[in-house]
Amino acid sequence: MENGATTTSTITIKGILSLLMESITTEEDEGGKRVISLGMGDPTLYSCFRTTQVSLQAVSDSLLSNKFHGYSPTVGLPQARRAIAEYLSRDLPYKLSQDDVFITSGCTQAIDVALSMLARPRANILLPRPGFPIYELCAKFRHLEVRYVDLLPENGWEIDLDAVEALADENTVALVVINPGNPCGNVYSYQHLMKIAESAKKLGFLVIADEVYGHLAFGSKPFVPMGVFGSIVPVLTLGSLSKRWIVPGWRLGWFVTTDPSGSFKDPKIIERFKKYFDILGGPATFIQAAVPTILEQTDESFFKKTLNSLKNSSDICCDWIKEIPCIDSSHRPEGSMAMMVKLNLSLLEDVSDDIDFCFKLAREESVILLPGTAVGLKNWLRITFAADATSIEEAFKRIKCFYLRHAKTQYPTI
């Protein structure tokens, strides 16, 4: 794999997507092509992805009750914390309590909390590559050294555990595991997660489990929470309502100590958590108050519909990728909302790298893809498939036209 020459600390996904949008000069109302974005992981951009009526009613009832217009406790409303503990406990061999749960403003704030709590002089953290660039941004702000562990596309984007052992030392504080995977669309097996836990225990660090895409698994492997292995190694579980309930703008996330052995039960650690949350601003109180109803009353049919839509969209992507020689995917998505495809520059006449590809594609075809450099892999592309079938079909038709326009001329051999 070719890794990004530009570190993700200098690039944000939203930043580069904004630049790509700005590069599109044609306007639809002036006869230009409709802009299709397969770059941002926000399913609400497409009408086929909508949250449940249960969620909407719960928030409406909470807001109109006039009971939740004031400040909430800094760690979150007790009833919301309790509901999240019960929700996560369904998939664990032990029960969480509300004291294990801290409510955050989206999963991004949970990431910042986790890294802030682990920061200390000379500490380092192991991050997956490709991954989510917010981790490196937060680490840099907290003066945490970042060490990258490559994911292996030939093995379904599994973590290279030999590399983990080679990179870790006495100052390694944690390994980040994103499952289901963003940006790769992978889902880790029980066996692989067990090996991760055993490696972390052996090497003496904890695991940060980013499960913002939790349960969004539509392949052959079911979603297994990292917290299942909490008795082997301490796990900090990060998650949110954003993806599974299709409400990223509600900013309701959680930071959870999935740790039945009690490593985080030290009064000094708990007090440090609470003091840090005292300086944070959590989600709106009325959103928190709706959480118990949302978690307890959402019908399973809603989740099945979402999974069916994501699988159908990912299948359309995979079928089209076979028709475009300059992009290739060795791994069919099994979950989340995105996938990585490799760019074959040798087949293109005047495209220098993944960033050049994406900017020229945006200008010429009004299609937005995310350059792999933004997530740590140069000359790869991240494609988000949380979109309707019509938009995906049209986007890939344009990508194919772009390829044909820029394909190297094949001269006949004499």
Swiss-Prot record:
Its EC number is 2.6.1.-. The keyword Transferase applies. It holds the Pfam family Aminotran_1_2. One of its GO terms (molecular function) is pyridoxal phosphate binding. It is an enzyme of class 2 (transferase). The keyword Transferase applies. One of its GO terms (biological process) is tyrosine catabolic process. It comes from the Eukaryota. Coiled coil: none annotated. InterPro entries: Aminotransferase_I/II_large, PyrdxlP-dep_Trfase, PyrdxlP-dep_Trfase_major, PyrdxlP-dep_Trfase_small, TyrNic_aminoTrfase. Keywords: Aminotransferase, Pyridoxal phosphate, Transferase. Its cofactor is pyridoxal 5'-phosphate. GO terms for cellular component: cytosol. PANTHER family: TYROSINE AMINOTRANSFERASE. This is Probable aminotransferase TAT2.
